[in-house]
Amino acid sequence: MNAILTGQVFYSYQHELLERGSFADIGAHFSGIKPFHKHAGEIALSDDKLFISGDENLQIPLASIEQIYLGFDEAFPRTLVKNFGVFWQPLRLSLSNGNKLYLIIDYNMLGANNQLWFDGLKKLLSD
């Protein structure tokens, strides 16, 4: 695999976000707490696949990504992010199998590299 981008990732499926308790919304605003997520690992982007390894091992063909979205929605609201999303927003992938993945890539307490990954995915998907 010839990686275009690599990084560390926190992620959740849409159903996991919708099933979270109210403590997750409150806990997100404490210093030193990582953003809400159910899974963690490493992520790599090649010219035809997205690879996630960690507590799950996923290989997502880029052809199966129906939509990418950078921002908040009803499943991942601003209340889940410290400073209500001033410094970063989640990256959502809508897949052809009906799953929606919410990614937080290279989080460092101040921000994340989601914009870089959004731009990279957008470029590959438009080619």
Q: For each predicted feature, which ranges?
A:
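Phosphoinositide-binding peripheral membrane targeting modules
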Residues: 35-86
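Intrinsically disordered, low-complexity boundary segments flanking structured domains
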Residues: 1, 56-57, 89-91
